[in-house]
Regions:
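Helix-to-loop junction immediately C-terminal to a conserved catalytic motif
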Residues: 49
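Conserved ABC ATPase "signature" region
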Residues: 107-124, 175
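Helix N-cap at the start of a conserved alpha-helix in ABC-type nucleotide-binding domains
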Residues: 164-166
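Conserved catalytic motifs of ABC-family nucleotide-binding domains
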Residues: 149
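Conserved ABC ATPase signature
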Residues: 128-132, 136
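Catalytic Walker B motif of ABC-type/P-loop ATPase nucleotide-binding domains
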Residues: 153-156
Length: 222
């Protein structure tokens, strides 16, 4: 088990967002979090790398309570790709080098090319991110997350802002990350068909509560 949530909850003065969510993510596995808009999917995901703080419960990363891990180190180990690509001004290569540079590490030219080739963008290192299409920018987001050598990836509706062709390309990348690199992930999606294509297990959220969880086929059939 790479990541385990234990009775995770979050509430704000006007609303309970997540209630007693418990689940685990295993090596090489994609876990889908599925539910209607407003069910707490993204709120739950944001708790997994402490973008938001839980009001109850905790998360264990490789057996360690994540409150014992420095936030910057936690976000290196738990990578995230959001619905829309948030890239820094500059070149593609500069974006990939940002995270490692914050830790005093240098991302070599060959590693930049390897990461870009892995997301179908070989030779894009010198391109200005302002000139990328939406699909290309999202693929750079994946390469940037992978540049930090994460232990798990959090994916928050990573294809919902893309056209059909770009969506297929990103789904292929997600499958290859799991199959070839063994990096597990948590995928938030409202698209049940996408969950079936990409995930091995799923949990269904309703009003912040996990109402079903298990193997993807069983959960989606219920």
């Amino acid at each position: 088990v790479v990541l385990r949530a234990e009775k995770l909850g979050r509430g704000v003065p006007t609303k309970v967002l997540v209630v007693d969510a418990s689940f685990e993510v295993r090596k090489g596995e994609m876990l889908a979090i599925v539910g209607p808009s407003g069910s707490g999917k993204s709120s739950l995901l944001r708790l997994l790398n402490r973008l938001d703080e839980p009001t109850s419960g905790t998360v264990y990363l490789d057996g360690t309570d994540y409150r014992q891990i420095a936030p910057r180190e936690l976000r290196r180990r738990v990578g995230m790709v959001t619905q829309r690509a948030f890239l820094f001004p500059g070149t593609v290569a500069e974006n990939l080098r940002f995270g490692p540079r914050q830790r005093g590490e240098t991302l070599t030219e060959s590693r930049v090319e390897e990461l870009l080739a892995g997301v179908g963008l070989a030779g894009y290192g010198s391109r200005d991110v302002a000139n990328l299409s939406g699909g290309e920018a999202q693929r750079v987001s994946f390469a940037r997350a992978l540049a930090n050598s994460p232990e798990v990836l959090l994916l928050d509706e990573p294809t919902s802002a893309l056209d059909d062709e770009s969506k297929r390309e990103v789904e292929t990348i997600i499958l290859e990350i799991g199959r070839e690199q063994g990096i597990p992930g948590v995928l938030v999606t409202h698209d049940v068909a996408q969950a079936a294509r990409l995930a091995q297990r799923a949990l269904i959220l309703e009003a912040g509560r996990v109402i079903r969880s298990g193997a993807i086929a069983e959960v989606l059939r219920a």
